[in-house]
Amino acid sequence: LRGDLPPGSGKPEMYASDLVTLLKEVADFDISVAAYPEVHPEAKSAQADLLNLRRKVDAGANRAITQFFFDVESYLRFRDRCVSAGIDVEIIPGILPVSNFKQAKKFADMTNVRIPAWMAQMFDGLDDDAETRKLVGANIAMDMVKILSREGVKDFHFYTLNRAEMSYAICHTLGVRSEEHTS
């Protein structure tokens, strides 16, 4: 992850595809790269963004993990576009369990992620009710995982934002358990 550049620092001289190439020259690392179902905010177009992902994969990336999204259809369309573009690595969906809708909206605005109207309505009136927000957010994330699973997705990436409890509870509810808890 590049992170946010300091103001006035200009564009980077090196890109992710360059880093993948360099790493593959050192050793056969297992490399995941970023992908953007709703297009990277700095991309000139959806096609340019897709070609950038293709360059990263052609350089040796083993898989792509997407930016978080809330519209499952945007991920499915993106996955189809990847296949059509000859991108033959797994496209792992990034799931952001929302416990703070205002914060999620801020993240979404910065990253070109659309928040569906139905989702905003689900959080409406919950500004002062953190527990209910967590339940709503967990249910949305679980529904997304269930739909994506039915569409053939096997692996998921959860954005925990350094708060793993909610993702742990989601995984537990979906039947994903650590080996120590299944014996």
Where are these regions (language model features)?
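Catalytic-face loop-and-helix region of soluble metabolic enzyme cores
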Residues: G94-E151
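Conserved small/polar residues in nucleotide/adenosyl-binding loops
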Residues: E180-T182
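Active-site beta-loop-alpha junctions enriched in small/polar residues
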Residues: L1, A34-H40, F69-F70, G94-V98, ...
